[in-house]
Amino acid sequence: MKLKTPDEVPQKPGVYIMHNKEDEVIYVGKAKKLKSRLQSYFRDEDKLDRPKTQFLMRHFSYFEYILTNTEKEALILEANLIKKYRPHYNISLKDGKQYPYIKITNEDFPRIYITRNIVNDKASYYGPYTDSTHARAFIDFLNKNFQIRTCKHMDGPCLNYQIKQCSAPCVNYISQEEYNRNIRRVKLLLQGKYKTTIKKLKKDMNRYAKNMEFEKAAMLRDQIDTIKITLEKQNIQPNQDVNQDIIGFDHNNEEAAVVILSVRSGKTNKKDDLVLKGIKGFSDKQIRTEFIKQYYSTAPLPDEIILEDDIEDKDVIVEWLEEKANHKIKITVATDGHYITLIKIAKKNAHISLTENTKEEENPLLTLEKYLNLPRLPYHIEAFDISNISGIYAVASMVVFENGKPAKKMYRKFKMNTPGPNDFAMMKEVITRRYSHISPNNTNNTSDSLSIHPDLVLIDGGKGQLGMAVDVFKKLNITDVPLAGLAKKFEEVYLPGQTNPIILPRQSSALHLLQYVRDESHRFAITFHRKLRSKAFTKSILDDIPGVGKKRKQALLTHFESLDNIYNASFDEICQVKGINQKLAKTIYETLKEDKKE
């Protein structure tokens, strides 16, 4: 059921799914009391709790809800829906496709390999691994020491069997039971249960030795030695019987870096670096909570998760994780000196990771907000351009950028009513027509995209064009929409009330974004203008030529590929068009020639 208000929603646990007017899912949330939570969204914009909620409600069209029996069920459903839809306004763990997983297939004789896609195929997945080199090295170690097959089709013994790196299940040199016993050992290692693996290997080794199967016993002895050498080159931690994840966070306005120090069987076994996107407006507690929910929906679960500070809904999250792991799990805050030190190490690494990410990928919206001293992040930018030939077929374009990217479904085209070749007056007309649709009090809770108050309006031009837009806004009583003019000659940015322009650095991502917006508005206007011109050309010229019907007109367009090419074609070139004889070609050529003279 598509709902506009929460009046009919019950006070029960559940999940709500918000959509925009294009039916895209833009936010997924859960609540113990659905109605109360949803009511918090339907207030005046200045009373909404954070800027991101304001942006969300500007694009809101309707919502749906799903009731659950418990808050835990709501939590699980929310996590699954976020993973499915990846909504724009939810905090999101950087796309999991960028991180590799180790996959153990669901075959009679399973294989182990790297994948970046998790599918519902009953296979076992372990990860994500932020270091693909480490993951591949680990797979090589497992395949070699447990003699796991690597071939996709079991066609007979291969080189790996000859060099004792495969047990050759393809020709039954190993039973399915024995092979899958090795797979179970591999799974224990991937879960970080090294002591359990070694204990089981020793038990099997002693059994083989007792039965005088010395070759098999020696193989297990070598596996035990290799595991000890390979996986236990770590500093010993105080609690050697508990598997722990120690997690440190650092963040700026847009993203958070997360570092996980994984301690397995008392050894620091690996360090993972991950990124959370879309955190602007969320508290530190909310960021920690969203990370725990998203990361541990797929990652192996330790016995204890140690954080710098607490999370929301801890009891419900612990209950959910324990059900997934089938063992007790604790989420604790570091109080012991040793763990406080490890948290500091994780935070320091997160800070380094965040700094490197920021250097590599400057956020143009943040930079633009800073340089232009805007009141808010310019998430929604609108820009205009005029296209005409001496006032004929005059059109204007409006392009929209959201989050630094073209939002083409929101583009608009305008046919100009202003007479004569007056770009200045045409720009005034289109600005007036566009912004007469929005209300001065900034009520954006509607599905009409033209009612949205932009975060920045970009005018193509300098002081004069900008001043014209300022006058229009004054007449319309619009005071909360920032304006800027981009003068093309020196790429200077003009702001209302400022005499001197702002010169953005040539390599600035903010300048590149403004240029992209300006150029896109120009492209869109030119395309519309050419379409009108072409339509008028085909109607007034080709349709008036005797002998040129629909099929021959199409033949001309197919042959010459554009109307301009037809217009400039020679007599001989027109003769080459299929279905057009010399007599008709002469008529077409002379008609177009006369039209050019006019």
From Swiss-Prot:
Pfam family, one: HHH_5
Keyword rRNA processing: no
GO cellular component: cytoplasm; excinuclease repair complex
Keyword Nucleotidyltransferase attributed: no
Membership in a protein family: Belongs to the UvrC family.
Description of how the protein assembles with itself and partners: Interacts with UvrB in an incision complex.
Name of the protein in its database record: UvrABC system protein C
Organism name: Methanosphaera stadtmanae (strain ATCC 43021 / DSM 3091 / JCM 11832 / MCB-3)
